[in-house]
Amino acid sequence: SGEVTHKDSSGGGGTIQTGDVQWMTAGSGLVHEEFHSPEFAQAGGLFEMVQLWVNLPAKDKMTQPRYQAITRQDIPRIDMDEGAGHIRVIAGEMGGHLGPAQTFSPVNVWDGELKAQYETTLHVPEGHNTILVVLKGEVVVNESHKVQDSSMVMFAKDDIAIQLQALQDTQFLL
C-alpha cells in the first residue's frame, strides 16, 4: 500500500501506487533512488513494499539497465472458484496467463490472496527455485507446515504442487 517514486541514472522512473509493480534490471549498472512522492509525503499514510532480487544469468549481466513500471491494470488476475481468492501474474505464466514483466531468467512471480478456510493447489515448474512469502495472514502448506505472516518457506526443486490452506485471510507471493 502507499506510493513510491523511482528515478535512476538510465532515465528510468515513475511513481507506482498500491497494486502496481516496478521491475528494474540493473544490468551493466545504474544508480537509483526511491522515495515517497511529494503528494504521499504530504498526505501521509501506510507504506508497504516488497523487493525481490533475481540474479541475472552470466550472459546478461552487462545488459543495458531497464525500468518497467507495471500498473495493476496490466497485471492479469485469475479469480479462484467460489470467491476463494485470486492470483495476479506479475512475471512468468500461470494457466495460460502471461505476466507483463520482461525477465532474463525463467521466473514466475505470483501475487495471491486466499480467504480464510479456503484452499488451493498451485503448480510450479519442476526444477525451479520456489519461495512462498506470507505477507499477511496464516496458511498451512502441504497439510503439514503452518506459516504465519512475515515468514517465508523455500521448497525443494521437485515440489511442483504446493497446497495452501488459509487459516486467516492471507496475502502471499510465490
Where in the sequence are the language-model features?
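Long amphipathic alpha-helical segments that form oligomerization/scaffold cores
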Residues: 53-87
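A short glycine-rich, His/Asp/Glu-containing loop-to-beta-strand
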Residues: 1, 76-121
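Short acidic-glycine-tyrosine-enriched beta hairpin
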Residues: 7-25, 124-125, 130-133, 138-166
